[in-house]
């Protein structure tokens, strides 16, 4: 695995690294959005990687907030990685000072590394898998504010109603990364941030419903109980999740589809959005168009809020 990941250092970025060529798909609120968006819908802010802030009625909920962006060489060579407080502080300028809850889809570092620090800064509670909760508390998150979430569970937090769904992680070189069973310890190196049980979430507030996962496999599609989905945020980082893209969009039938986890999460977010070396957004667009999938395909740029109409 180490040599395979190190090989990614030699993979060129796609020719158009940013969102410029897809400007017609990029959505954002006006510079001075109406106050009504606070009370009549859900406002979505993309935080990078698979991270999002959702706002409703003056409350905020985060999913997978990760800002530190450990460098690829440190990950490939399994060097110690730690949250970067200065980088996290800069990113949190775009997040509400108080956050009700953080949801985490799985225990990998690019989803969980910064969560204990974000909890400290925002007062948030954490809901995540048993593995992710153990990793977070070992990394300094207060146990009293960490709750284990399991598929089938449902809970309310602020204006939010959250349903927890089963999910799967894409395979990389034939297996899900960092999925081996091993004793959990204080995480220091990338491989210490174990996958655990992947989760997806159905988030409801103000008559809007958002589905979010971090990727998946064709054999596992979500069961939303027939609920209408306004926005589907679908991880498309690797081939497994792109292979299931058409099937999951047909299953969810969302009004809007937002492909996620397709930026280069080894590059600092201050450089702006750049597609990752293993992503293939052109495939996603082609699939949407050729198969005439339901809903509208959209993109969000870092820290530019958009309110679901």
Where do the PLM segments sit?
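Pre-active-site segment of Zn-dependent metallo-hydrolases
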Residues: 34, 59-104, 108, 113-117, ...
